[in-house]
Amino acid sequence: MNLPDTLLPCQRPRERLLRLGAPLLNDAELLALCLRTGRHGCNALELAQRLLTRHGGLRGIFALSAQELCTEPGLGVAKACSLLVAPELSRRSIEETLLGRQAMKHPEEVRRYCLTALAHQPVEHCIALYLDQQLQLLACGELERGTLGRASVFPREVVREALRLHAGAIILAHNHPSGNPQPSAADCAFTQQLSQALALVDIRLVDHIIVARDQALSMAERGLI
């Protein structure tokens, strides 16, 4: 990992990972393990710390596009690819855990999935979790990028995909890049519009979760559905 000789073996991220486990490593150490190597005059741990400082933490780094990562000093294509796949692997792992399980019996896992999928996004994204009649997860999918509900065709697309999957219910989720989890008037209006469109084909909108950084707000729990 191009770490300096002054760093004792027991202090190196790889050795600490094997000895202590990932939860006890700090962000810079975990990021250094993803990067594997540093650059000239800068070891992997130092490069990781510089990235965290420059972008305000992991969320800022994972919000970068492929092009932005590739142009970061000291990264290049290989390191950029390692960083691009990390949050996606986490999201897919949680999705596999949820598949076939009753979503409403595992609300914390649903929130964790939504946070993993959306918290790092720099612009609004919307995803849907399609459930069967027993509220078991059938599939997850991305629906929209940009301001929620801007396109009038959007509710029809949700209904069409739900029918294709033979879904009986849906959980919707989108993010607020501003960091404010409170639903806007537009969020509430769109939620009602989608709920009514789904009801026409006997599909229930179970919840609409708003993700804002490390928060996940349930509109159903607020009585807004």
UniProtKB/Swiss-Prot annotation:
For this protein, the record's InterPro entries field holds: MPN, RadC_JAB, RuvA_2-like, UPF0758, UPF0758_CS, UPF0758_N
Q: Which domain of life is it from?
A: Bacteria
A Pfam family that the UniProt record links to this protein: UPF0758_N
Alphabetical keyword list: Hydrolase, Metal-binding, Metalloprotease, Protease, Zinc
In this chain, Zn(2+) is annotated as bound at: H174, H176, D187
Which residue ranges does the record assign to the MPN domain? 103-225
Q: Kindly indicate where the leader peptide sits in this chain.
A: none
The membrane-spanning stretches of this chain are: none
A GO term for molecular function:
metal ion binding
Q: Which GO terms describe its biological process?
A: proteolysis
State the span of motif (JAMM motif).
174-187
Family assignment?
A: Belongs to the UPF0758 family.
Alphabetical list of PANTHER family matching this protein:
DNA REPAIR PROTEIN RADC, UPF0758 PROTEIN YEES-RELATED
NCBIfam families for this protein = PRK00024.1 (NF000642), radc (TIGR00608)
Q: What is this protein called?
A: UPF0758 protein BAV2405
Source organism per entry reads Bordetella avium (strain 197N)
